Each structure stands twice: as structure tokens, then as C-alpha cells.
């Protein structure tokens, strides 16, 4: 389902969701970068030149022109990229699998830091009104974040349409503030010349190199452009960037620089200081609204990433709540929301100011960009069939830039940047253990089972006691291709329903599955059929709804009413064994067993959208 259409409505929507993070970077990026060095014209022009060319090369060229080509049938993001690699059956799948799940973990860590630094930096504008208000910055920011996370369960369907216009107001506001300063001191326009960036780095030496860690803050949020392709399409995102976001950001950065050339003492808060005093309070309100929207976009993106991971079988079936009946992409993941809330509040309370938060922010995003570069470079060779020379030249440049930023960000590891990285390793390990455990179950407990059709013959199926008028639907999980729930039912009961449907779902490596490819059916007996339902990794799995559509289209050889049928699911009870080694480590087996016990029964029923009052769980026992 490729999304190349363009409308101004989509462009406005993209402005509100895609550019919230990168659009609020002027609140803190220039202040953090220039802190600790002399505030003079040479240094300001050098830093502005680095900002200008970073936005042009990293965001405008690398992401919007090159990385955008690596979409998976219109969907972007690191997990969609992983699915694309799997779809092409590359021999390096295991490597990219590890890379992708680590990258997903990094994005979750970023989802903790972005709301913290964005909201705190906006509320710090209160200090421009009065020094006496500084002590209230952290409590107010914390209150805003508490409200933000507590309202996630309500969804954004009612107010989401306002995000685009509100962020547009934000961009227009910061652009006007920048223009007013540039008109007074147009000398800052010299920074467009890359000479000033090079001269600054040469003159500052090692100190100048480490200042790239601050420069990188202006491109954080650039990864959201690729991740949100599926929501708005490539062309609306490109339009919003080149005609609104990029010009407004540059005007504001250059405006801050122009003001600092003549008023270097205002480095304490250069963003708010370019506004006239009478506009401080309105600007604080606008900035706070913009940062809340930016935070909401990051939280929603994390929810979407989690849903992709669940559907691709990379993590357990944690509860996913649909918050809108009209838009399938509007979801709420309670457990992820709680983790993000705890992490965000911990960062706020531990670091207290945007300056301190900036010393931890960026390294996780930097690593994620580096991983995406590597995956897209391989896609360019193996899928796009680019020449090796062109790939080495182009992506060598990208990797060199990202590695340069990463080197400059390394000092952030010990000042708080280690938290999202350690979290990423932990999440990646959980995903790896879950995936490896499912593969072990499939290969050792289910793959060796005898074919159902043979078992039916051995049991003399037609001679079994029939339950006339009863229809039963047996749901089998992704690791079970043999119909385990049905076989266990036969063992426990020597009677069978009149109509039996064994349902297995498969999540394909594409975002959406066309109706013509949705169903596969195999008749095992006159009244026993096996149905495979295909879903895309961006779709919501709803077994009853899919079955109802199949009945309406007369796909099944027998008639039954989905609203009265009984559903059967198999719940494996996994036990770890010290004597028998299945996974790499005993504690890894314990982790997998814990996840299976806590994310199987009720969550399977919720995941498949099965009716609780007509669903029976059948237990089975597996020793690893």
C-alpha cells in the first residue's frame, strides 16, 4: 500500500506529528552548544554554519532523499526495514535482526528523554519573567508530564487534528522572531558559507570537535521522518520540511545567533531572549504546547513501534488498546506508557534542568541513525542493486558523519546517556529470548507432530461422537503449525463439534495484506478445515472479524455463525530445566518461561479479540 499521494491536509498533519521533536530543538540546542566557549562573532558564525549544513546533509539529503527510498510498501522505521530484509530473504537476516531489535530499544530510551528535555526547556522560559519563578520550573514541568502520560488512555482522536495547526503557529512564531533579529544583524547570513564551519573546527581543535555533540541536538527528531512515512507519505513530509520546518528552524537559529553577537550575556536563554519582553508569557505558552505535542508524537511512535514488534513476533503479546474506532493507528499500550512515564520522571527529577538533560540526550538517537545507515546501505546493494562503488562512496560519507557525531557524543555516556543504551540492551535481550524461545517451541514441540489428516484417520474421526449444531474454532499460535489446540481437545474429549475450523494467523513482512491474499484454506475432512489468515505488521489482528468476512465471502465450505461459535486456544505452560539445556542460559529459559506464563492466557484472548464468554483455554505442558 504505497502512499505517494499529496494533499495540503496531509502536509499539515505531518507538520504536527513528524516535526514536533526536531521543531522544538531551538529551545535548547544553541544554548547547549555555545555554553563553555567565548561568545564572539567567529564562534557564533562557525556554530551556525555547522547547524545549517547538518540540517542540509543529515536531514534534507540523507533522510529525505536516500533513506526514504528504503520504505517497506509505504511503511518506514527500523522494524519495517527489518521486515523488508526478511521479505528479501537475505543471508544476513540474523545480523540485521540483532541490529533492529537493539535499534528499537534505543528508540524506547529516546522516548523517555525527549518529553523530559522538551517540556523542561519550554517551562524554563518562566525564568525570563522573574528569577523568583525558577524554583517552580521543575514542579510545573513534572505536573505537565504527569497529565500527559495519564491522559494517554483517552487517546488523541478528539484533539489530534489540532496538532498540525498548533505546530504551524509555533514554526511561524519562531521564524518571525528570528527574522526580526536577522534584519538588525544580517552578518549572521555569512554562516551559510561552509568556510566558517571548517574554520571553527580547525581553530577550536578537540574542543570544537566535542561541540558537535551539541550540534547533533539540532537533528534529533530526524529519525521520526523515516518512521512516520506510513502515516502521511513521503511527499507531504518532504513538502512540510522544505517549505515550512527547515526555513523556520534556520531563521530562528540564525536569529538567536544574531542576537548573541551583540548581546552575548543572553546566552543563559537565547531562545526566549530574542522575543520582546511583552511576548515572553505568550511565547512560553506556545512553546509548552509545542513541546507537549512533540512529546505526544514520540510516545505515539513508541506505541506504534511496540505494536510492530508484537505482530512480528519480536516481543510478548502485551496488551494493546485501540483508542479510536476510526483510525487503527491510534493505540495505547499501558505497560509501555508506564515504563516511559517512570523513565521520563526519573530523568526530570535527576537532571532538573534542560542543560543537564542535554548532556544525556542524543547518543541513543545517534546510535539508532548509525544502525539505520548500515541497514539501508545493505538494502542499496542487495535490493536496489546499486553499484558497490556508489554505495561505499555515499554511505561511507553518511557513516563518517554519524561516527563523527557519535565520537563527540561519547562523553554523554557517563553523564546519563548510559541509561537509554543499557535499556536498549535489556529490551533487545528480552526480544531475542522471546524470539529464540518461540523458534525452539516450534522446532521441538510442534514441528515433529504428526499431520492432522493422518491423526483424523487413525482416530476414525467420523466414528467419534458428534455434537450436532455446534461449531468450534481452534486458534493456533504462530509457532504451532499443526493445530495443537484441536489435537489436545481430541485427547481430552472423545466427542467433536459438528463443524471444526482450525485457524492459524501469519504476519507477513509487509505492512498491509490485500484481501485477495488474506486467506488460505485446506479441507482436512468434510467438516474439518484449516484456515490461515494473513495480516500485515501494521494491521490489527481480529480473528472474529476476519472470520465473519470469510463467511460473508463464502470462502469456507460449511456455514457457521461466528457470533455463536466457541473459540479454543492452547496455553502452553513452559518450565525451565537445569538438566536440559534448550536456550543459551538457564536464566534465559527462566525469562522465556516467565514471559509465556504471564503473556499467554488472557492476553492471547485479548490479542485475537476473542469473546471471553465463548472462549475456552486448553493447557499443555512443555519442559525446555
From Swiss-Prot:
Catalytic activity line of the entry: K(+)(in) + H(+)(in) = K(+)(out) + H(+)(out)
Name the UniProt record assigns to this protein: Probable potassium transport system protein Kup 1
Topological type in the membrane: Multi-pass membrane protein
GO MF, any single term: symporter activity
Its job: Transport of potassium into the cell. Likely operates as a K(+):H(+) symporter.
Family listed: Belongs to the HAK/KUP transporter (TC 2.A.72) family.
Keywords: Cell inner membrane, Cell membrane, Ion transport, Membrane, Potassium, Potassium transport, Symport, Transmembrane, Transmembrane helix, Transport
Transmembrane segments: 10-30, 48-68, 94-114, 133-153, 159-179, 210-230, 242-262, 270-290, 331-351, 363-383, 388-408, 413-433
GO cellular component terms attached to this protein's record: plasma membrane
Organism expressing this protein natively: Legionella pneumophila (strain Paris)
Name of the gene: kup1
Superkingdom of origin organism: Bacteria
Localization, UniProt: Cell inner membrane
Amino acid at each position: 500500500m504505497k502512499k505517494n499521494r499529496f494533499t495540503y491536509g496531509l502536509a499539515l498533519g505531518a507538520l504536527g506529528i513528524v516535526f514536533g521533536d526536531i521543531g522544538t530543538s531551538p529551545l535548547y540546542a544553541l544554548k547547549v552548544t555555545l555554553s563553555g566557549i567565548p561568545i564572539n562573532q567567529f564562534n557564533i558564525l562557525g556554530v551556525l554554519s555547522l547547524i545549517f549544513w547538518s540540517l542540509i546533509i543529515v536531514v534534507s539529503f540523507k533522510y529525505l532523499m536516500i533513506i526514504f527510498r528504503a520504505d517497506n510498501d509505504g511503511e518506514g522505521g527500523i522494524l519495517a526495514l527489518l521486515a523488508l530484509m526478511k521479505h528479501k530473504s537475505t543471508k544476513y537476516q540474523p545480523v540485521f535482526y540483532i541490529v533492529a531489535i537493539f535499534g528499537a530499544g534505543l528508540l524506547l530510551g529516546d522516548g523517555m528523554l525527549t518529553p523530559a528535555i522538551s517540556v523542561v526547556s519550554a517551562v524554563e522560559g518562566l525564568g525570563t519573567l522573574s528569577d523568583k519563578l525558577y524554583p517552580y520550573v521543575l514542579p510545573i514541568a513534572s505536573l505537565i508530564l504527569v497529565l500527559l502520560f495519564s491522559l494517554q488512555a483517552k487517546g488523541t482522536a478528539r484533539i489530534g487534528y489540532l496538532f498540525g495547526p498548533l505546530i504551524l503557529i509555533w514554526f511561524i512564531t519562531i521564524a518571525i522572531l528570528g527574522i526580526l533579529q536577522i534584519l538588525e544583524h544580517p552578518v549572521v547570513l555569512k554562516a551559510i558559507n561552509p568556510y566558517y564551519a571548517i574554520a571553527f573546527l580547525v581553530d577550536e581543535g578537540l574542543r570544537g570537535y566535542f561541540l558537535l555533540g551539541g550540534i547533533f541536538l539540532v537533528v534529533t527528531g530526524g529519525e521520526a521522518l523515516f518512521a512516520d512515512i506510513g502515516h502521511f507519505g513521503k511527499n507531504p513530509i518532504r513538502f512540510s520540511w522544505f517549505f515550512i520546518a527547515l526555513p523556520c528552524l534556520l531563521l530562528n537559529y540564525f536569529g538567536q545567533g544574531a542576537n548573541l553577537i551583540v548581546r552575548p550575556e543572553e546566552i543563559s536563554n537565547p531562545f526566549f531572549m530574542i522575543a520582546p519582553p511583552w511576548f515572553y508569557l505568550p511565547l512560553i505558552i506556545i512553546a509548552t504546547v509545542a513541546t507537549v505535542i512533540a512529546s505526544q508524537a514520540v510516545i505515539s511512535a513508541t506505541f506504534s513501534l511496540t505494536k510492530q514488534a508484537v505482530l512480528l513476533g519480536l516481543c510478548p503479546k502485551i496488551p494493546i488498546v485501540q483508542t479510536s474506532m476510526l483510525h487503527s493507528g491510534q493505540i495505547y499500550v499501558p505497560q509501555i506508557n508506564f515504563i516511559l512515564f517512570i523513565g521520563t520522571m526519573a530523568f526530570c527529577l535527576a537532571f532538573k534542568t534542560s542543560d543537564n538533560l542535554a548532556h544525556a540526550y542524543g547518543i541513543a538517537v545517534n546510535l539508532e541513525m548509525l544502525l539505520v545507515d548500515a541497514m539501508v546501505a545493505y538494502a542499496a546493494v542487495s535490493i536496489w542493486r546499486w553499484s558497490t562503488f556508489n554505495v561505499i562512496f555515499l554511505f561511507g560519507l553518511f557513516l563518517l558523519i554519524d561516527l563523527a557525531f557519535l565520537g563527540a557524543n561519547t562523553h554523554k555516556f557517563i553523564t546519563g546517556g548510559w541509561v537509554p543504551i543499557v535499556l536498549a540492551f535489556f529490551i533487545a535481550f528480552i526480544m531475542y529470548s522471546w524470539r529464540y524461545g518461540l523458534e525452539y517451541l516450534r522446532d521441538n514441540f510442534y514441528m515433529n507432530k504428526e499431520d492432522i489428516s493422518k491423526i483424523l484417520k487413525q482416530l476414525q474421526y467420523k466414528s467419534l461422537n458428534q455434537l450436532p449444531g455446534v461449531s468450534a474454532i481452534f486458534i493456533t499460535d504462530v509457532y504451532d503449525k499443526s493445530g495443537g489446540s484441536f489435537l489436545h481437545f481430541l485427547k481430552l474429549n472423545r466427542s467433536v463439534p459438528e463443524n471444526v475450523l482450525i485457524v492459524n494467523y501469519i504476519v507477513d513482512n509487509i505492512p498491509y495484506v490485500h484481501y485477495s491474499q488474506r486467506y488460505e484454506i485446506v479441507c482436512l475432512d468434510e467438516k474439518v478445515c484449516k484456515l490461515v489468515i494473513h495480516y500485515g505488521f501494521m494491521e490489527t489482528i481480529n480473528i472474529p472479524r476476519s472470520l465473519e468476512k470469510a463467511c460473508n465471502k463464502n470462502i469456507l465450505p460449511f456455514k457457521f455463525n461466528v457470533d455463536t461459535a466457541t473459540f479454543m486456544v492452547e496455553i502452553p505452560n513452559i518450565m525451565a530445566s537445569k538438566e536440559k539445556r534448550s536456550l543459551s542460559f538457564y536464566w534465559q529459559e527462566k525469562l522465556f518461561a516467565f514471559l509465556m506464563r504471564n503473556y499467554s492466557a488472557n492476553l492471547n484472548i485479548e490479542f485475537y479479540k476473542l469473546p471471553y464468554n465463548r472462549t475456552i483455554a486448553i493447557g499443555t505442558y512443555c519442559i525446555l
